[in-house]
Amino acid sequence: MMELNELRETIYKYALQNAVKHNGKAETGPVMSKIIAERPELRSNAREIVKIIKEIIEQVNSLTLEQQLTEIKAKYPELLEEKKHEEKRKVLPPLPNVKGQVVTRFAPNPDGPLHLGNARSAILSYEYAKMYNGKFILRFDDTDPKVKRPILDAYDWIKEDLKWLGIKWEQELYASERLELYYKYARYLIEKGYAYVDTCDSSIFRKFRDSRGKMKEPECLHRSSSPESNLELFEKMLGGKFKEGEAVVRLKTDLSDPDPSQIDWVMLRIIDTAKNPHPRVGSKYWVWPTYNFASIIDDHELGITHVLRAKEHMSNTEKQRYISEYMGWEFPEVLQFGRLRLEGFMMSKSKIRGMLEKGTNRDDPRLPTLAGLRRRGILPDTIKDVIIDVGVKVTDATISFENIAAINRKKLDPVAKRIMFVKDAEEFSVELPESLNAKIPLIPSKQEMNRTIIVNPGDKILIESNDAEDNSILRLMELCNVKVDKHNRKLIFHSKTLDEAKKVNAKIVQWVKSNEKVPVMVEKAERDEIKMINGYAEKIAADLEIDEIVQFYRFGFVRVDRKDENMLRVVFSHD
């Protein structure tokens, strides 16, 4: 248990915070929740901790509210820095079997960009390491230069995406640079009789496997051969004496296992790297470890305590457990979660890779890649909230883009600038009795951030074609009410106030002064298509920064993608 004085200090802090929130009276339950969320390992001492909490709450509640506030300001000023518009993120449940430092890892295959599905493991692994003040490791699982061939750029894509999510790693390594280590462990397992070299045709091994050991062992299998004989064959593999497909190293497992994939699974195989060079190490190696062999070796070497992975890896967990038992290692605690499906997007890594190979960029807003979501204006905190909210559940989860947009909108609403934008624009001259000023809030929650647009009699303005119905009365946002004379291309002054607009049920529309217009091209993802929308924004749009996310009135949120000489290019986020 943490030092008693430190524990009492932490309880006192949260008791003060809870008291101030509830008119000077703290309660045991919320304070206890804070303590357990911060230090999950204390759950086993809950009974003793509750006694201390009650004692300290009695002390805190004896203070006046003013005294409580004074105490917080003096000792814990950070508690008063409330994030007004940030919703409280759901707390992950405690990890099982925490004994010392928690060490987690994310082990992506760099054969494509990260998407929402495979980023789940990264976010959960990092958040748990952070929760326990542990260690988070980034390990590139790049040991298949043929079937799941790494893409050289993908290493940087993944690191860029993780940094965008706010994920920091203490160690970075590449499985493709650790082959000598895997060879060392392979030799040991062969020496101990736990592994052997199979030189049979794969069809022969399948017959042997399917017989569950009843079939006489083929001579080419070498399962019963001496360790010395198998070591000699292994050295021949390393020496290039066998071609691809002529020899593999297998782990001895239970021949009666009902799952055929578990029976004597392949630890290492030969890949012709002259034909399929690895993007990092070229053709230096031709004997490559399989995913399961390399993973369990590195999990042990790196001291991984908890592995968070999709339940589709359940079979892999059992395969890796064999090696752990042969080596006498403690097996990491494995937490498995269901698939995460995003409605309206393709989640298949192979399909995404196919699009990339045909020239589609990884940040295409149609894709569920992190780069695509980022370019679309989805905030990293939104992604993290979605993943943490789903949590570690074995059941599959489905998230629609509408869910993501709703969370993103809540985060953007209080801080995003509002800009007037007109698509399908029609130009009209405005007939006014005098010059008028439109004072429009840049951010509604910050009324002091107004901008003033002066409109003089006869000025030309743009409104949307759909709004320009002949003889209709419109309210030009924050300016005045006008009647549409479509034939003469005029907007004729009707009245000034919003109340008068309400009396005639006038539609409130956005508008742009013609002589101040900023040409805008909107890139909008619609299922499998990209739609380009032309329009004009008000003058202030020219001052927007790249990556800034703003709301176009009556259109939606957009992210500034590029600023060309005569065009502002934005990507549509959501309504």
Swiss-Prot record:
UniProt GO BP: glutamyl-tRNA aminoacylation
GO molecular function, one term: glutamate-tRNA ligase activity
Gene Ontology cellular-component annotations: cytosol
Function, as annotated: Catalyzes the attachment of glutamate to tRNA(Glu) in a two-step reaction: glutamate is first activated by ATP to form Glu-AMP and then transferred to the acceptor end of tRNA(Glu).
Record motif 'HIGH' region, residues: 108-118
UniProt keyword list: Aminoacyl-tRNA synthetase, ATP-binding, Cytoplasm, Ligase, Nucleotide-binding, Protein biosynthesis
Catalytic activity, reaction form: tRNA(Glu) + L-glutamate + ATP = L-glutamyl-tRNA(Glu) + AMP + diphosphate
SUPFAM superfamilies from the UniProt entry: Nucleotidylyl transferase, Ribosomal protein L25-like
Keyword Protein biosynthesis set for record: yes
Family membership noted in the UniProt record: Belongs to the class-I aminoacyl-tRNA synthetase family. Glutamate--tRNA ligase type 2 subfamily.
Nucleotide-binding among keywords: yes
Domain of life: Archaea
Classification via InterPro entries: Gln/Glu-tRNA_Ligase (IPR050132), Glu-tRNA-synth_arc/euk (IPR004526), Glu/Gln-tRNA-synth (IPR000924), Glu/Gln-tRNA-synth_Ib_cat-dom (IPR020058), Glu/Gln-tRNA-synth_Ib_codon-bd (IPR020059), Rbsml_bL25/Gln-tRNA_synth_N (IPR020056), Ribosomal_bL25/Gln-tRNA_synth (IPR011035), Rossmann-like_a/b/a_fold (IPR014729)
Cell compartment(s), UniProt: Cytoplasm
Protein name per UniProt: Glutamate--tRNA ligase
EC number(s) on file: 6.1.1.17
Source species: Saccharolobus solfataricus (strain ATCC 35092 / DSM 1617 / JCM 11322 / P2) (Sulfolobus solfataricus)
Enzyme class per UniProt: ligase
Chief place where the protein resides: cytoplasm
